[in-house]
Amino acid sequence: MAIIMDGKALAVNMQEQLQEKVARLKEKEWIVPGLVVIMVGENPASQVYVRNKERAAKKAGFHSKTVNLSESISEEELIEVIEKYNQNPLFHGILVQLPLPNHINEMRILLAIDPKKDVDGFHPMNTGNLWNGRPQMVPCTPAGIMEILREYNVELEGKTAVIIGRSNIVGKPMAQLLLEKNATVTLTHSRTPHLAKVCNKADVLIVAIGRAKFVTEEFVKEGAVVIDVGINRDEEGKLCGDVDFDQVKEKVSMITPVPGGVGPMTITMLMEQTYQAALRSLKG
C-alpha cells in the first residue's frame, strides 16, 4: 500500500512557520510583506483561486489587495495598473491572474511585471535565472512539488524522472528543478509515442495534463513515486486527478492525492515567495 503524500498537512505546517517569520520581520524591520492580485474579468474558476490566495495572504499576516478590472480593459490600461504596483514599495509581490481575455497579449503583461515582484515566476528573466541555476522566483506548482519530495525524503540524484506535460507553468520548470537535483529527466507530451512504456521506466512520475484518470497502472512501475498535478471532475462529478488513484496506489510506493496533494502547496509557495521578495527588498 502506497504512502499518501499529504500536501495539505505540509502546507499547514509551512503556513504556521511563515506566520512566525512574518511576525519577526514586522517586529525587527517594520516591514509587512505585501501581495497584490490583479483579476481581469469574472472567470468563475479564477475568482475561486483569487479568493483562496487572498485568504492565505491574510492568514500569513500579509498586506493583501485584490484589484478587480473589467474584461474590456485595454492592454495599455492593464500595463498602467501593473506599473503603479511596480513602483509601490508596500507591495513585494504582483500576481496577474491567468487566463486573460483574448484581446490581451499575455506575454506582454508578464513582461510588464517587475521581475523582483513576479511571485508567479513567469517573467522571462526569472525563467532564465532558473535555467542558469540561479533561481529566485520559481513557478509555484513545481516549487511546491519539490517541497513535497523533500518532505518525504524522495531521493532524486541518479533517479529517472518522467514528466507528462510540457507547459511553461509546470512541465518545463519542473524538468529544470529535477535536473538541478541530478535526476535524469524525460519531458513527454501529446506527441510522445508509446507514452505508457516511457512512463513505466520512471522512478518519479509527475503528471500534469488535465485529463481525468488518464494514468493507469500500466504507466507506472512497481515502487515508483507519483505526483498528480491534475484537478478534474470524473463522470460522477467528483474531484479527481490525472492519475487513476485507486488503481495506481496498489503498485507505487508514494502518491499524492487529489484533492489534498499538490494544490495546497501551490498557494503556500506563492506566499513563501512573496515573503522572500519582501526580504530581498531590504537589500535594495
Curated annotation (Swiss-Prot):
Give the EC number(s) listed in the UniProt record.
1.5.1.5, 3.5.4.9
Provide the GO MF annotations for this entry: methenyltetrahydrofolate cyclohydrolase activity; methylenetetrahydrofolate dehydrogenase (NADP+) activity
InterPro entries with a match to the protein in the record:
Aminoacid_DH-like_N_sf, NAD(P)-bd_dom_sf, THF_DH/CycHdrlase, THF_DH/CycHdrlase_cat_dom, THF_DH/CycHdrlase_CS, THF_DH/CycHdrlase_NAD-bd_dom
Q: Which reaction does it catalyse?
A: (6R)-5,10-methylene-5,6,7,8-tetrahydrofolate + NADP(+) = (6R)-5,10-methenyltetrahydrofolate + NADPH; (6R)-5,10-methenyltetrahydrofolate + H2O = (6R)-10-formyltetrahydrofolate + H(+)
Q: Which UniProt keywords apply?
A: Amino-acid biosynthesis, Histidine biosynthesis, Hydrolase, Methionine biosynthesis, Multifunctional enzyme, NADP, One-carbon metabolism, Oxidoreductase, Purine biosynthesis
**Residues binding NADP(+):** 165-167, 190, 231
Q: State a GO cellular component annotated for this protein.
A: cytosol
What's the family? Belongs to the tetrahydrofolate dehydrogenase/cyclohydrolase family.
Which HAMAP family did the record assign? THF_DHG_CYH
Q: What is this protein called?
A: Bifunctional protein FolD
Tell me the classification of the organism that encodes this protein.
Answer: Bacteria, Bacillati, Bacillota, Bacilli, Lactobacillales
